[in-house]
């Protein structure tokens, strides 16, 4: 290859590289609207997280609220069941009807749930306990603990006389026993 051929080849190669570098002769392009759906820094989160059963396990849904809800208020919403849109996504509730029977008391870093029935006997199953525990843990519990560190003390058969058992909401929305 002669130096003349090499020079011509180099000129063609540089011309090809220069045209493919992505610099447009028309100037900057418009980017469109700013990102949306992201909470602005400093804005208060005005939503509540409820847990329902779905085709692939426990699923969290977020609903807008005017102010933070106590665990009792969040559980009242859970007891109403999924909305029409949530049902269309395949979400259901394994929590049996218990309006007026569920007692909820929140203290610093903990929530006491007094539930009707006994878990594992057909009256309440593990999915229902997960729904109740995780919904309560993600509500406005005193003490500012992360939801995964809130103790949910479950009292069965509408009594407080028996020793409760404690669970926490796991990262996947399932109730995890606390061993002490």
Regions found by a protein language model. Give the residues of each.
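Bimodal "functional hotspot" detector
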Residues: 1-180
């Amino acid at each position: 290859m002669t130096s003349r051929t090499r020079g011509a080849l180099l000129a063609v190669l540089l011309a090809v590289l220069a045209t493919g570098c992505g610099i447009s002769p028309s100037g900057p392009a418009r980017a469109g609207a700013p990102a949306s759906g992201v909470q602005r820094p400093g804005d208060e989160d005005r939503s509540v997280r409820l847990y329902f059963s779905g085709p692939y396990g426990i699923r969290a849904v977020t609903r807008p609220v005017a102010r933070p809800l106590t665990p009792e208020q969040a559980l009242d919403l859970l007891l109403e069941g999924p909305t029409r849109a949530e049902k269309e996504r395949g979400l259901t509730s394994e929590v049996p009807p218990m309006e007026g029977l569920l007692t909820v008391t929140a203290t610093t870093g903990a929530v006491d749930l007094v539930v009707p029935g006994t878990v594992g006997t057909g009256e309440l199953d593990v999915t229902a306990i997960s729904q109740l525990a995780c919904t309560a843990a993600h509500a406005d519990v005193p003490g500012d603990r992360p939801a995964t560190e809130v103790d949910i003390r479950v009292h069965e058969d509408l009594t407080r006389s028996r020793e409760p058992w404690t669970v926490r909401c796991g990262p996947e929305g399932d109730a995890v026993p606390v061993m002490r």
